[in-house]
Curated annotation (Swiss-Prot):
Keywords: NADP, Oxidoreductase. It comes from the Eukaryota. InterPro entries: AKR, Aldo-Keto_reductase, NADP_OxRdtase_dom, NADP_OxRdtase_dom_sf. It comes from Arabidopsis thaliana (Mouse-ear cress). The keyword Cell membrane does not apply. This is Probable aldo-keto reductase 4.
């Protein structure tokens, strides 16, 4: 295993935001990956991350829902807030038990105010639209976010799972600081359009699930150990008919990591780190030992030949199964109507 080293700092985007080169995805502490973790343990892990130099903390109002933001708010008391860059998201509503993606101005503002209250802070550092509302022109959503920047409620604007054309349209209204997207050795379709678009526009790239939702940390046995309400149980890539094929990638990563003297997870994470100085992966974990391993990936150095070898075993399209079920929108269905089509209620 590669030992943890200091976490370098990096510029995210072109508007002045500086963050740790690796962030902490906080979702799994409260939602989707089984039962919520005990509050004291979750806060201890967050504090350990910050003490180790991981200062970009990523949450969303949908994690819990809402409870993850409350947890972060508690963890940032007593002067801790000033030590971190805090990112949260809006855009997925569960009002009256109905799941809905919303980007209308009224909802954008209400969601921001609610997040500020739950987090118990005056300003959000990086505020993402979690999913794109395909009924509302992105210019309308961005217009309200721009107002929130001007009012000092948020500092920087981000998009998550947005298409290349939506990113361009949004960026024309107000600079986008970061696009959060799934990027890992087994999710590489973003390399075709999303990544080049971000780089052309000077937008930072935040890679979520850089360990393939834990697959590269544990391999196929991950599925056997998932709690009954872990949403990964339903993901296409973890179904038996696809897993038998996908484990080939893990086995080859294991072979290379053994030669490198690091874990498979560290190797997979190092591959993301080596994509460029504009890329910040945000692996999540519920265990301090795993956090240390993730930070250790920063010390794994890969040669161009090793990068080529890794990419050859995980070429785009090789992995079987979609990232999500058909019910969850992604950048592939994230176009919005033209601004001329908008009629405010």
């Amino acid at each position: 295993m590669a030992e943890a080293c200091g976490v370098r700092r990096m510029k995210l985007g072109s508007q002045g935001l500086e963050v740790s080169a690796q962030g902490l995805g906080c979702m799994g502490l409260s939602a989707f990956y089984g039962a919520p973790k005990p509050e004291n343990e979750a806060i201890a892990l967050i504090h350990h991350a910050i003490h180790s130099g991981v200062t970009l903390l990523d949450t969303s109002d949908i994690y819990g829902p809402e409870t993850n933001e409350v947890l972060l708010g508690k963890a940032l008391k007593d002067g801790v807030r000033e030590k971190v860059e805090l990112a949260t998201k809006f855009g997925i509503s569960y009002a009256e038990g109905k799941r809905e993606v919303r980007g209308d101005p009224e909802y954008v503002r209400a969601a921001c105010e609610a997040s500020l209250k739950r987090l118990d802070i005056a300003c959000i550092d990086l505020y993402y639209q979690h999913r794109v509302d395909t009924r509302v022109p992105i210019e309308i959503t961005m217009g309200e976010l721009k107002k929130l920047v001007e009012e000092g409620k948020i500092k920087y604007i981000g998009l998550s799972e947005a298409s290349a054309s939506t990113i361009r349209r949004a960026h024309a209204v107000h600079p986008i600081t970061a696009v959060q997207i799934e990027w890992s050795l087994w999710t590489r379709d973003v390399e075709e359009e999303i990544i080049p678009t971000c780089r052309e526009l000077g937008i930072g790239i935040v890679a979520y699930s850089p360990l393939g939702r834990g697959f590269f940390a544990s391999g196929p046995k991950l599925v056997e150990n998932l709690e009954k309400d872990d949403f990964r149980k339903a993901l296409p890539r973890f179904q038996e008919e696809n897993l038998d094929h996908n484990k080939i990638v893990y086995e080859k990563v294991c072979a290379i990591s053994e030669k490198k003297g690091c874990t498979p997870g560290q190797l997979a994470l190092a591959w993301v780190h080596h994509q460029g100085d504009d890329v910040c992966p945000i692996p999540g974990t519920t265990k301090i030992e795993n956090l240390k391993q993730n930070i250790g990936a920063l010390s794994v150095k890969l040669t161009p030949e090793e990068m080529t070898e890794l990419e050859a075993i995980a070429q785009p399209g090789f992995v079987k199964g979609d990232r999500y079920s058909n019910m969850i929108p992604t950048f592939k269905n994230a176009e919005t109507p033209p601004l001329s089509a908008w009629k405010a209620a």
